[in-house]
Design a protein with these regions (language model features):
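Extracellular jelly-roll beta-sandwich "head" domains, especially the C-terminal globular C1q domain
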Residues: 1-151
């Protein structure tokens, strides 16, 4: 089955500064924004609403991928969590044997329910990446959200 309405938002941060434990990761600047329905009156329902937040405003399934190379000052455990409207959905953990870079990837599919009018808690969905486990001194990251709507 082909995709009738494919949407992508990709953000990149090549200079993440220090982030404390439980802090939100800065997602950076938009490097790619694609909508096959552009100009057809169909809204682009993926947007960056803050330096650390991506907002999903229409029902559907969204593939989320966060990958980063994060620098730690000493041996530690680095954990990043995908947060949706303040609730942790998923997390991944990597260990660092000593000071240096830790590569971490967080893939997850997120569903946004369509009954926004009846239950406004469902929409919009604000996605954030939260640092847990250990503070970082810097790094780079890529955050990508895509969806395909047919019909």
């Amino acid at each position: 089955m082909s995709c009738q309405n494919y949407r992508v938002l990709e953000m990149q941060n090549n200079n993440i500064g220090a982030v404390a434990i439980n802090g939100f990761m800065p997602l950076g600047r938009v490097t790619r924004r694609i909508s096959t329905a552009a100009g057809s009156g169909v809204p682009f329902e993926i947007s960056n609403s803050a330096a650390d937040t991506v907002q999903l405003t229409s029902k559907g399934y969204y593939n989320v991928l966060y990958s980063a190379s994060l620098t730690v000052a000493a041996a530690s455990t680095v954990q990043v969590a995908l947060i949706a409207n303040g609730v942790e959905l998923y997390n991944v953990t990597e260990s660092a044997a000593g000071a240096g870079a830790v590569n971490i990837t967080l893939p997850k599919t997120v569903r946004v329910f369509g009954n926004c009018a009846a239950n406004s808690e469902n929409c919009p969905v604000d996605l954030q990446i939260q640092l847990k486990g250990s503070a970082i001194t810097g790094g780079t990251s890529n955050f990508r959200v895509d969806s395909c709507v047919n019909g």
